Amino acid sequence: MNNQLENVFRFDEEKERAKIRESPWKHDPEFFRSVKISAVALLKMLRHVSQGMPLEVMGYVQGKVEGASLIILDSFALPVEGTETRVNAHEEAQEYSVQYHTLCKSVYRHENVIGWYHSHPNYGCWLSGVDVETQRQNQKYQDPFVAVVLDPKRSLESPYVNIGAFRTYPVGNDGSIRTKSRHHPSVLFKNLPSSKIEDAGAHAEAYYSLPITYFHSKAEKKVTEFLRNRNWSRSITECSILQNNEFLHDSEKLIDHLIHETGNNELPVASAYEQSKACCNELSTFLSQIDVQDKLFKE
């Protein structure tokens, strides 16, 4: 790992405290110009929102500030109830977040919570009126803070991740301080369901978009290459073999049946092989996901 990349992953708690004490973003509503996301943080978010479809789900991102960039190093899901159009964090989710952050520190992961993410299944990445108010409250009390939105359905149907990162303007300054470079990308509000057009347009001046780039360590690169060479959408969305009780139960019944039939010479070995082939293929697929899902994505 080169020094520049190593520095991205290194977290200096004292330096981070100094940046927060200085808080230059309080004097410049457009202080932050970009967001950088690690590969594992992105995959964890994508896995969570994909498995949550068709409901909206949410979580937090952890990381640090580097110049005018917010660096997202990790993410974790929140146990919140969502609907097909809205998700809200309750007190239990806040308690969970505090406990999770405490446990992270106990294993020397000191990165701060620097934002939240949630999903917009099949209606793009932008901030609704509720999202804008939530983000404004977060920036008021927890800054630095960024809002990340992912569309899992569109992501799984295309070769790229449908994602956006946003920060809100202070109340009363909507759009009046925006520079030309901060306007939303034209693609942001394309192909919206008719029920979402009004909400999306009504609050577009209340926030700005931040360009997103990605980075990965050598270990993370192996994960992304693994997914690229396989059916990545299936690997992301399906439960692991350790969680698929129905598959395990059906496989156990099939194996018991084949052992009984072949043991009593009632079924030729060739026939037993043919009957078990589908099960073996499915098992092979699930086994290929264990390292990725149950080790690298384990929360």
UniProtKB/Swiss-Prot annotation:
Keyword hit for Electron transport: no
Pfam families, from UniProt?
A: JAB (PF01398)
What's a GO biological-process term for it?
proteolysis
* Ranges for domain MPN: 35-172
GO terms for MF: deNEDDylase activity; metal ion binding; metallopeptidase activity
Q: Cross-referenced InterPro entries, in alphabetical order?
A: JAMM/MPN+_dom, JAMM_MPN+_peptidase_M67A, MPN
**PROSITE patterns of this UniProt entry?**
MPN (PS50249)
Q: Give the chief site where it resides.
A: cytoplasm
Per the Swiss-Prot or TrEMBL record, what residue ranges does the short sequence motif JAMM motif cover? 118-131
Enzyme Commission code(s) on record: 3.4.-.-
Binding-site residues for Zn(2+), renumbered to this chain: H118, H120, D131
Where, per UniProt, does this protein localize? Answer: Cytoplasm; Nucleus
CDD domains noted in UniProt: MPN_RPN11_CSN5 (cd08069)
Q: Name one GO cellular component term.
A: cytoplasm
Entry similarity comment: Belongs to the peptidase M67A family. CSN5 subfamily.
Q: Give the protein's function.
A: Catalytic Component of the COP9 signalosome (CSN) complex that acts as an regulator of the ubiquitin (Ubl) conjugation pathway by mediating the deneddylation of the cullin subunit of SCF-type E3 ubiquitin-protein ligase complexes.
Q: How does it assemble?
A: Component of the COP9 signalosome (CSN) complex.
Domain remarks in the Swiss-Prot or TrEMBL record? The JAMM motif is essential for the protease activity of the CSN complex resulting in deneddylation of cullins. It constitutes the catalytic center of the complex.
What protein name applies here?
COP9 signalosome complex subunit 5
UniProt source species: Schizosaccharomyces pombe (strain 972 / ATCC 24843)
